[in-house]
């Protein structure tokens, strides 16, 4: 009987750990994605999507709208960057970001910011 109660206690503890760790991972992902969206909005950069230029606020609104429609499928911040924030779902073309005459893909730009964010919030 004692062995059974110890096993039951162990199962309960493991279940609690899984529940808590899943919630923490979800909160971290949400915090990270919200930070990236705010990072886009507050930048002084020009966002180039399918050859047309947009302001930082327009870029954030566009990416946030895409994310809202499929957020239940996005499990990580990296997936958010690669599938939502870095390329057109219609043309497949990469989004570009132009900051102070330097142009790069939004995937590179946001991946770097995600690394910076994580290093500040460990």
Where are the model-predicted features located?
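Bacterial N-terminal signal peptides that target proteins for export
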Residues: 1-12
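Compact alpha-helical subdomains of small soluble proteins
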Residues: 51-122
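Bacterial N-terminal signal peptides
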Residues: 10-20
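N-terminal secretory signal peptides
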Residues: 26-66
